[in-house]
């Protein structure tokens, strides 16, 4: 074991990174060696057990906890670990498999100090107290105890050591024992000018390495600013922490892996947790809200401030309590206000997630003891009630908190009804769930998809495809299968109206209810605990009026939102001192009540590109009821096909049917207040609007970009639905091979099946299209990619530099316009486009833009059945 491990250490050292944590098999072999250690290897073996085994409910932690428990109970002996030291090591495992052992050890017969001549490993000198005292000390700093809290509370009535634990939790000693943030902090600046998106920090081409934090961090900024890692290493020689600084920081979707990479290079090791770092300082003129929250979760200190006077190599002093930044001469160069109110406590606790868990544990303990709330913590300051009405979003979040509504600025923990995870973030979410000691989800429905890696899987992806389904379904989650399609296209069909959720993908933007996308750590928290911390954002109302003009599509309406905001001075494309009215706020959309839910998602989905915290759209009861009837049929079909967890699917079906029996939707109040109101007159939009290379905010009229040659066209992503593919086929029908490389990737297997049944795929074949497996395909650029330096017209979500291909120029627009681009090999003029649409699409629009109503498809519920009808009837 040691020989093979040292070979692995050498391979990783050549890359400048530490070895992987031990797996269960290695840990088991390590435990055997610890019983009879080879001479001279004692320190190495002890280090491996203490520092190189992941905590929580990792399989290796199960082995470690069992071994240490056996030593503590004197069932097994090791010459280098005493029973008391074993208890102390159990206390470093954060929760999960160690908890029950420590509770048992609270009651274990006295072990005198003479049982060992070893000095303690962790918690100071051994006195004359029994082993139960050490178990109490270990549990006092263990926060992830879940239902075991009640066992310890009951035991504390008769057991003095259990009483010590309860008293310690009540006094928040887990928190007060940690150092406060100092009055001033000297840091060395590492600045990336302009915008740093999460693709820069966590390149999609390296997505498969994201769970391996040190390895993935080697790719940070490799395209955006080559040589950055060497620069950071050089800056560290000044002897101060390195602060990451940028004008705009953290836009994009890969927040957790991006934060992991930043903190790997600028943060500090977490004791007893291998290959993970916390802390660090991130300064930005603007910091994307989800990225900001993910930094909070990880124990970093994110600061939004003017960074124009900060340059790489400067040594600056941050004064966190004064809100000042000074240079080496003591001159003031920037000011800031720390947000949220609790940020100092978050940093002290090691992150927002540990603070929330620990503070809840302290509050629960004090409540059980009839003590007043602790004054140790900075409590969130709640806003003054204005007496005005609530917006739709405020009512939805209020409902999830048991309130009529929630005001902006309110700190709350809404119930998470639906949680989504996908396959490039799922392995990180799994690791976070293990660290949170989660063995069962508290959120009502947690879904895992396999949409980003199914088409061209690497060996590590195949491993993920095999392991993640059981991991999620064994905890009560719903696991999709590779080839099923895109997370959002599926998760939307599992939603309940007027509820709140989240997902580990920035495009988790529910068209029913509201969602607040999050990094993998917070998604794991939401799944494990069933709630999520939220500082309620303000809302921006986008109100449409008028009628869609000929040739204008919903994607043009999506792009009209930033277009109008730019005209009104509410949004700028430039990154320095960027203005964005939507950033960190909820976009609430009205004026299009009769859209189908599939169409509505185009609008809510694109709020990710506006850096919104969330979004709502006002729809009619009839629209929502039609969608839910279809979704009931789909979920019943999943049960018939053997999808797990069937109990979760059955529960969601029952909830949908209950809503259909009494279909009522929340509505915003007429006197609700908004940070801004933007009115868009559809009658004034006479030509398509596209996002030009390479920024989703860089929107232009078609007439401004006409005749630009296009080499590749992509029709796919969560922004598409079945109508787009029918319309594209109609444009291409009878035209022979197109003049571009054309990629086709439907969002789900159901779309693909229906399109094949209708003969649409034969048109794609005749056009020379490359048809892809249902899923994300080119959108994220983590597998297939366009040619280097090419110009692309795409229906996907984002057009960041190098995302779809190295040096690619990417336009974003409608499927209909994409089809015309493929036909012509260039962006058409307005008249060319309108003529083609008028002749090839408008006459057939009613038939083309039909949506998948599964309840109306004969025999659909029995398609792919592997569970007999009798078995299914018994389940139901």
Predicted regions and their residues:
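N-terminal alpha-helical segment
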Residues: 5, 64, 82-83, 98-99, ...
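Amphipathic alpha-helical scaffolding segments comprising HEAT/armadillo-like alpha-solenoid repeats
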Residues: 24-33, 55-74, 95-123, 144-156
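Short, solvent-exposed loop/edge-beta patches enriched in aromatic
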Residues: 41, 53, 94, 437-444
């Amino acid at each position: 074991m040691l020989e093979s491990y040292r070979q692995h250490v050498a391979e990783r050292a050549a890359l400048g990174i530490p070895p992987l944590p031990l797996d269960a098999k290695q840990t088991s072999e390590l435990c055997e060696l610890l019983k009879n250690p080879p001479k001279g290897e004692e320190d190495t073996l002890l280090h491996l057990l203490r520092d190189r085994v992941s905590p929580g409910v990792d399989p290796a932690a199960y082995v470690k906890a069992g071994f240490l428990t056996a030593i503590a109970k004197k069932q097994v002996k090791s010459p280098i670990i005493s029973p008391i030291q074993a208890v102390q090591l159990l206390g470093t495992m954060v929760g999960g498999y160690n908890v029950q052992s420590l509770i048992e050890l609270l009651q274990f017969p006295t072990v005198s100090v003479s049982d060992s001549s070893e000095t303690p490993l962790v918690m100071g000198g051994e006195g004359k107290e029994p082993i139960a005292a050490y178990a109490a000390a270990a549990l006092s700093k263990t926060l992830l105890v879940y239902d075991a809290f009640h066992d310890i509370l009951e035991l504390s009535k008769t057991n003095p050591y259990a009483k010590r634990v309860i008293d310690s939790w009540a006094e928040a000693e887990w928190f007060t024992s940690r150092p406060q943030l100092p009055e001033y902090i000297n840091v060395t600046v590492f600045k990336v000018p302009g915008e740093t998106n999460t693709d820069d920090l966590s390149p999609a081409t390296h997505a498969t390495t994201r769970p391996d934090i040190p390895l993935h961090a080697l790719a940070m900024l490799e395209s955006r600013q080559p040589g950055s890692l060497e620069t950071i290493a050089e800056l560290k020689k000044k002897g101060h922490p390195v602060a990451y600084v940028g004008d705009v920081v953290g836009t994009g979707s890969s927040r957790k892996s991006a934060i992991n990479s930043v903190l790997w290079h600028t943060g500090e090791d977490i004791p007893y947790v291998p290959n993970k770092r916390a802390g660090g300082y991130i300064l930005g003129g603007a910091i994307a809200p989800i990225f900001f929250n993910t930094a909070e979760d990880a124990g970093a200190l994110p600061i939004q401030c003017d960074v124009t006077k900060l340059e790489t190599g400067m040594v600056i002093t941050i004064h966190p309590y004064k809100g000042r930044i000074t240079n080496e001469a003591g001159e003031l160069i920037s000011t800031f206000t720390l947000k949220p109110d609790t940020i100092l406590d978050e940093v002290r606790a090691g992150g927002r997630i540990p603070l929330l868990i620990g503070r809840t544990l302290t509050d629960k303990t004090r409540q059980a003891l009839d003590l007043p709330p602790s004054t140790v913590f900075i409590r969130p300051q709640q806003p003054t009630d204005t007496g005005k009405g609530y917006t739709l979003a405020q009512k939805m979040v209020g409902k999830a908190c048991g309130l009529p509504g929630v005001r902006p600025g309110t700190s709350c923990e809404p119930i998470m009804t639906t949680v989504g995870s996908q396959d490039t973030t799922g392995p990180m979410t799994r690791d976070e769930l293990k660290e949170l000691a989660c063995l069962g989800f508290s959120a009502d429905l947690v879904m895992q998809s396999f949409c980003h890696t199914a088409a061209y899987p690497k060996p590590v992806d195949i491993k993920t495809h095999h392991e993640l389904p059981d991991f999620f379904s064994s905890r009560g989650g719903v696991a999709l299968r590779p080839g099923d399609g895109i997370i959002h296209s599926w998760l939307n069909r599992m939603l309940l109206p007027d509820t709140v959720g989240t997902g580990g993908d920035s495009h988790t933007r529910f068209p029913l209810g509201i969602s607040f996308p999050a990094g993998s750590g917070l998604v794991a928290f939401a799944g494990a605990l069933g709630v999520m911390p939220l500082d309620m954002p303000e809302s921006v109302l986008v109100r449409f009026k008028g009628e869609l003009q000929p040739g204008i599509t919903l994607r043009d309406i999506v792009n009209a939102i930033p277009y109008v905001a730019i005209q009104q001075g509410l949004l700028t494309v430039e990154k320095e001192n960027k203005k964005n009215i939507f950033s960190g706020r909820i976009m609430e959309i009205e004026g299009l009540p009769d859209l189908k839910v599939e169409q509505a998602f185009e609008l809510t989905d694109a709020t990710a590109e506006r850096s919104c915290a969330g979004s709502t759209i006002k729809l009619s009861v009839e629209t929502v009821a039609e969608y839910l009837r279809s979704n009931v049929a789909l979920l019943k079909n999943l049960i018939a096909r053997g999808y797990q967890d069937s109990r979760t699917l059955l529960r969601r079906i029952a909830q949908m049917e209950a809503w259909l029996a009494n279909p009522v939707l929340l509505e915003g109040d007429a006197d609700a207040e908004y940070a801004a109101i933007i009115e868009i007159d559809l009658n004034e939009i006479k030509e398509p609007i596209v996002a030009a290379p390479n920024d989703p905010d860089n929107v232009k009229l078609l007439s401004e970009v006409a005749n630009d040659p296009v080499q590749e066209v992509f029709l796919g992503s969560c922004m598409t639905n079945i109508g787009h593919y029918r319309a594209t086929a109609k444009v291409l029908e009878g035209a022979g091979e197109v003049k571009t490389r054309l990629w086709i990737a439907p969002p789900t297997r159901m779309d693909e099946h229906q399109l094949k049944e209708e003969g649409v795929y034969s048109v794609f074949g005749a056009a020379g299209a490359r048809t892809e497996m249902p899923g994300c395909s080119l959108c994220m650029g983590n597998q297939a990619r366009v040619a280097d330096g090419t110009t692309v017209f795409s229906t996907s979500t984002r057009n960041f530099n190098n995302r779809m291909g190295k040096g690619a120029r990417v336009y974003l627009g409608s499927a209909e316009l994409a089809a015309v681009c493929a036909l012509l090999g260039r962006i058409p003029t307005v008249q060319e486009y309108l003529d083609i649409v008028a002749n090839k699409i408008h006459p057939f629009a009613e038939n083309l833009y039909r949506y998948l109503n599964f309840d109306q498809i004969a025999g659909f519920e029995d398609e792919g059945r592997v569970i007999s009808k009798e078995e299914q009837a018994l389940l139901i």
